[in-house]
Amino acid sequence: MHVVLPDGKQLELPMGATALDAASAIGPRLAQDALAATANGELVDLMTPLPDGASITLITKKNPGDAAPLFRHSLGHVMSQAVGEYYRAKGYSDDRIKRGVGPSIENGWYQDFDLPEPLREEDLPEIEKIMREILSRNLAFRRREVSKAEGLAQFPHDPYKQELIQGLPDDEPITFYQQGDYVDLCRGPHFPSTGRLPGAFKLMSTSGAYWRGNEKNPILQRVYGVAFASQKELDEYLHQLEEAKRRDHRKLGRELELFTIDPLVGKGLPLWLPNGTVLREELAGFLKEQQFRRGYQGVITPNIGNLELYKTSGHYPYYADGQFNPIEVDDEQYMLKPMNCPHHVRIYASKPRSYRDLPVRLAEFGTVYRYEQSGELNGLTRVRGFTQDDAHLFCRPDQLKKEFLDVLDLTVLVLKTFGMNDVRFRVGTRDPESDKYVGDEANWELAERQILEAVDEVGLPYTIEPGDAAFYGPKLDFVVKDVLGREWQLGTIQVDYNLPERFDISYVGEDGQDHRPIMIHRAPFGSLERFVGILIEHYAGDFPLWLAPRQVMIIPIADRHNEYAEELRSELHAAGLRAEVDDSSNRMQAKVRTAELSKIPVMLIVGDKEQEARQVSVRERSVEGHKERKGVAFDDLCAELLERYRARI
């Protein structure tokens, strides 16, 4: 057999040769430094037989980060071994320690356990200590294949491993990996030995997780760890994590009184508090203004609909698992609205349409409901009830590209208005092997081609993601990177030839015949809840003036200045600005501190001098730090703030 090296040269090897054999054939130093390899683009360990003719790249200690998924997975096994040793030292037998799944994930790994007593967060440093001791033993990772019967016999007291093994094919070998006396069911691959693993790791947290994600199954304890090729990378990651905690929208949402989630109301159903409502309405107002300029018409639809509506659209039963169960009313079935588009189609169909009427652009901030498992709910970014900035455009074929480009322009404008300039674009197309898609083959091909033509025309960088399309049509997603470098999918545009067919809608063309319109789905924010959650973290709660729920705090130095402060508040309020007076008995420094903690962007301090001259001392928060100005004429400042507010800066 032979393998192909990165420089294109072929290396002859005996049949069944491994990556380690390839490294040894090149030279003993390379064999000593090798950690893993890629074969035809897939990571493999050094002991796995290579396919004949495979293109291989050897990964060495000079570039261990290239093998990050391997060393993270191997460290997961080391952690699992350490947990076993920890509980044995406490007097528990091995059959009391049961394990679920333990994959590598982004930046690390997790492992699910069923333990005789729960691990506490304060136990994790001790587990880390045992892990480092296991690394020092330099235990080899050994792969072996066994039959299904042998596999079941390996874990007689572990129902989770038994279930996993029972689900494997009878006629295929089962692979185990072993280091020292620890054995686990695993496909691999792994590092050569524990001594070759990086020491830049940390156990982060524990949580509960249903076995196999099913709420009817037992809750296991999930332990998370992270690992990097170097301590510098780990330190940078931990610093970023601390910054993410500081910006956590759930924490800031409470502190800034933006939203709350009340268990009596229900999980995943946020309540918008007055401050959060202001923020939400500013977002909606901004988009409505843009939509008005572009010829959109507002509509309102109910929060429930007849089940037949969603059967016609195809949302039911295609996404039945993600929707709330139907309810029966007057011998008919209804369900909470999972999407706005079928309702908008019926509005389009409510009267005859001519080619002269098109395009029809219908927009709504419509609340929809999806059933998310409770373990997946997360503040505002994963909820069960949310409001989409939904619009649906109905157009002729000759109008499609122009309408698509206009929607694309609007979405980019929205994102850049909020400082989200690092944007990439993702075109979701069909997976030809999947049967989840509905509609005519020719229409799918046409829609996919026209999306790509539109994106090419504006010169946007993009990737094509097969299988990422909606069930009714291809789409363009906008992926933004926030200040922490995290990527979020915000905004989507979808071309849909399918729903017009399913609902049999039409317009009368110039030829007097009925024609089928093309439909575009569009939501620049995606959902207001998720967008607000991301904005809170993007700005760390320090919103620009126009978005800030509390824009101006007037701070009188003494009680005798309260009347002047209230006069200024009244004038700012009349001008359309959100202003308050802190007339508490606290000292001025304490009032400033309170306003700082509330992240109010503008503070106006007034004392004797300011009152006599109708002036204010200004203290502003900004990303660059604090800016202070003294002796500013109030009328000039009011005009300045109003101009900034209207310009949305």
Curated annotation (Swiss-Prot):
Region (Catalytic): 248-544
Pfam families: HGTP_anticodon, TGS, tRNA-synt_2b, tRNA_SAD
GO molecular function: ATP binding; metal ion binding; threonine-tRNA ligase activity; tRNA binding
Function in brief: Catalyzes the attachment of threonine to tRNA(Thr) in a two-step reaction: L-threonine is first activated by ATP to form Thr-AMP and then transferred to the acceptor end of tRNA(Thr). Also edits incorrectly charged L-seryl-tRNA(Thr).
Record-listed E.C. numbers: 6.1.1.3
BP GO terms, sorted: threonyl-tRNA aminoacylation
CDD domains: TGS_ThrRS, ThrRS_anticodon, ThrRS_core
Sequence ranges assigned to domain TGS in this UniProt record: 1-60
Keywords: Aminoacyl-tRNA synthetase, ATP-binding, Cytoplasm, Ligase, Metal-binding, Nucleotide-binding, Protein biosynthesis, RNA-binding, tRNA-binding, Zinc
Gene that produces this protein: thrS
Cofactor: Zn(2+)
Lineage: Bacteria, Thermotogati, Deinococcota, Deinococci, Deinococcales
Source species, domain of life: Bacteria
Known partners and oligomeric status: Homodimer.
GO CC annotation terms, alphabetical: cytoplasm
SUPFAM superfamilies: Class II aaRS ABD-related, Class II aaRS and biotin synthetases, TGS-like, ThrRS/AlaRS common domain
Entry's localization field: Cytoplasm
Annotated family: Belongs to the class-II aminoacyl-tRNA synthetase family.
Catalytic reactions of this protein: tRNA(Thr) + L-threonine + ATP = L-threonyl-tRNA(Thr) + AMP + diphosphate + H(+)
PANTHER family: THREONINE--TRNA LIGASE, CHLOROPLASTIC_MITOCHONDRIAL 2 (PTHR11451:SF44), THREONINE-TRNA LIGASE (PTHR11451)
Protein name, per record: Threonine--tRNA ligase
Record text on cofactor binding: Binds 1 zinc ion per subunit.
Residues involved in Zn(2+) binding: C341, H392, H521
